[in-house]
Amino acid sequence: MAATFYGVGSIALAMHEDDEEEGSGRVFGFAAGDLVRPAVVTQQLFPMTAAAAAVVPESTEQRHVAAAAEQWARPPSRKTRRGPRSRSSQYRGVTFYRRTGRWESHIWDCGKQVYLGGFDTAQAAARAYDQAAIKFRGVEADINFTLDDYKEDIKKMNNFSKEEFVQVLRRQGAGFVRGSSRFRGVTLHKCGKWEARIGQLMGKKYVYLGLYDTEMEAAKAYDKAAIKCCGKEAVTNFDTQAYEDELNLQSWDSELDLELSLGCSGGERAAGEVLHSAPSNQRTSLTFMLPEEEEMTACHRQRSIWARPSLAPAMPDGGAVIRPDQHQHHPSSRNMLLMSQVISSSGGGGGSGRQGAAELHMRPRHGWSSGGNNWAPPYAARPRLPGAEDDEDDDSAAAASSGFPMGQVATASSPSRPSSSSCSSRRSSTAAATATTGR
């Protein structure tokens, strides 16, 4: 006997083939009523249990909950004082800044971001960006509104340069005017006058510029201060060309003062300036002399220009020089002979003798037997040649030029005691040399 199973829903029917004709059937061994075979039978080979069907919706819900938890668990963005904007705009080149509370417009030009101003509404900032984009990039630039809205503005902007047009846009912004004035950097003081001040200068919050009777004067004072600080790129209330004459005049005055100060610094000596120096004072002083004094000074220069007090160490008896090492050093006979030849070759006359003494004084001092230091040699007296007359003037000029006292010159030149007439002439020459040096 064969049995046939029919599945209807979740109920399985078992019928014997012998009972098919009779129309009777059994369900799990129990007798059932007349059953009619359905036209279409759907069979499920691996039916899903109730427990598995309950697990599926729970896993889907868990996925959604986990994704939502991950989204909420992300760390919030760091907020700084001047950090990212709290709200972005739908317009191109417009940004809302929480710190200022305004919609600010910027445009990029040649790799630099140009500030166009702050506005109360996003639409006003977007229009400022559109005008700047048309000015910088032409009518084919990407703008927020249609090009027909700016037909009149295009005609006006052709008369301005880029810098001037940016200043015009900034003046139209809401952030340009502060306080109770319609000008930038100007406020009404409680005393009734208009106060001008400029902000963010040299690390200070603002710099006070003064009080003015009218609003226009205060605005001009602010413009001048802004131009001095920022140059041509400064944002001013009025056109910068109105201040060109005044700024050029101030720069010319400063250059003139600089030239005068440099001229007084003594780069080149002017005509008529005489330099006086003393052994005890190394400072240099410049004085102007009258024509009469210049003539007298020229005469003194011709007579005893090289006369000055002696700074060389005193020479003891015997023609020796005492150095700082407390040893006596004698010049060689060859050097003494050379110096005597120079003096004698200069001539027997008074003028030629003085010239030779001056040349001897200006020559470099060399040839000491020991050491290597260029100490001033003792005065080498001119030897008395037979048949030659003694010239007291030549001796006094040579002694004054050498820088040694007159007594030592007399001792070196003649062992005998000098006469009274020679002493008086020497005293007079020494007094004249001292007077010339004092001048």
Curated annotation (Swiss-Prot):
What does the UniProt function comment say about this protein? Probable transcription factor. Involved in spikelet transition. Prevents lemma and palea elongation as well as grain growth.
Family, similarity comment: Belongs to the AP2/ERF transcription factor family. AP2 subfamily.
Entry's InterPro entries? AP2/ERF_dom, AP2/ERF_dom_sf, DNA-bd_dom_sf
CDD domains attached here? Answer: AP2 (cd00018)
The listed locations are: Nucleus
One Pfam family name from the record? AP2
Tell me which Gene Ontology terms the entry assigns under biological process: regulation of flower development; regulation of seed development
Explain the induction of this protein: Target of miR172 microRNA mediated cleavage, particularly during floral organ development.
Q: Which UniProt keywords apply?
A: DNA-binding, Nucleus, Repeat, Transcription, Transcription regulation
Looking up PROSITE patterns in the UniProt record yields: AP2_ERF
* PANTHER family reported in the protein's UniProt record: AP2-LIKE ETHYLENE-RESPONSIVE TRANSCRIPTION FACTOR, APETALA2-LIKE PROTEIN 4
Q: What is its main location?
A: nucleus
Q: What name goes with this protein?
A: APETALA2-like protein 4
DNA-binding region(s) in UniProt: 90-146, 182-239
Question: Which residues does the annotated region (Disordered) include?
Answer: 67-88, 363-439
The short motif Nuclear localization signal is annotated over 78-87
| Basic residues: bias regions | 76-85
Q: List the disulfide bonds.
A: none
Q: Which domain of life is it from?
A: Eukaryota
Indicate, by first and last residue, each region the UniProt record lists as having compositional bias (Low complexity).
410-439
- Give me the Gene Ontology terms describing cellular component: nucleus
Q: How does it assemble?
A: May form homodimer.
S-adenosyl-L-methionine among keywords: no
Q: Which SUPFAM superfamilies match?
A: DNA-binding domain (SSF54171)
Keyword DNA-binding appears in the UniProt entry:
yes
